[in-house]
């Protein structure tokens, strides 16, 4: 079975950079990134590897909701300039890159989905818990910094909902890390309680008459924001990609 190792480029590099004693020591970031990717290849032994990078275009999520990811700390200018060199270093080692038009997330989700649809497997390297919605047979999430696969059961326990409810949970409670709003006045505990009782967002909205007046009002008034939040959190798994996987085969 072919296995594609998909590395979330900026997620990896920015965390490596943040851990450096001297943030201007870009050469060390470059070498640490290469070492990290080499270690992943040794650990997972994939047939193919690809590093996906965010592009410069405004994402469709930002167009849908202007506050999406608002307030994120911008990438240090020195690191931004060094990305080309980092990509070249990886390419020289046989680890090739793909740049998304905007966010890398949907491209990563599409690559993983296509691998499974073609009887392969995918390992996504990222600390972004948004990829948890993709976990199933032959799709795993690897945290390079903890050296662990995402334990979906532990993640379910943390949120107090099941995996199939993750997007409904975001629709209700939002996602503070990405500035996805959710419904005003509905926090993580209330969202989990509602989903444990009614199972789905649709069932919740079909049962407003069975809820307390204040909570029902919050849900009714926040219905459109719930719809937007769900869409913001949902990864697009069938983006049009014009690539040939052969160019990303690991050279033995």
Curated annotation (Swiss-Prot):
Cofactor remark from the record: Binds 2 Mg(2+) per subunit. Only one magnesium ion has a direct interaction with the protein, the other interactions are indirect.
Keywords in UniProt for this one? Answer: DNA-binding, Endonuclease, Hydrolase, Magnesium, Metal-binding, Nuclease, Potassium
Cofactor(s) for this UniProt protein? Mg(2+); K(+)
Positions binding K(+) in this chain are: 172-173, 181, 183, 186
Q: Which function does this protein serve?
A: Has flap endonuclease activity. During DNA replication, flap endonucleases cleave the 5'-overhanging flap structure that is generated by displacement synthesis when DNA polymerase encounters the 5'-end of a downstream Okazaki fragment.
Q: Which InterPro entries match?
A: 5-3_exonucl_a-hlix_arch_N, 5-3_exonuclease, 5-3_exonuclease_C_sf, DNA_polI_H3TH, FEN, HhH2, PIN-like_dom_sf, Xni
User: Which Enzyme Commission number(s) are on file for it?
Assistant: 3.1.-.-
Species in which this protein is naturally found: Shewanella denitrificans (strain OS217 / ATCC BAA-1090 / DSM 15013)
Entry protein name:
Flap endonuclease Xni
Q: Name one GO molecular function term.
A: DNA binding
Q: Where is this region: Interaction with DNA?
A: 185-190
* Pfam short name (any one): 5_3_exonuc
Annotated GO biological process: DNA replication, Okazaki fragment processing
**Which family does the entry's similarity section mention?**
Belongs to the Xni family.
| Record-linked SMART domains | 53EXOc, HhH2
Residue sites binding Mg(2+) per the record? 105
Presence of keyword NADP: no
Give residue ranges for domain 5'-3' exonuclease. 162-251
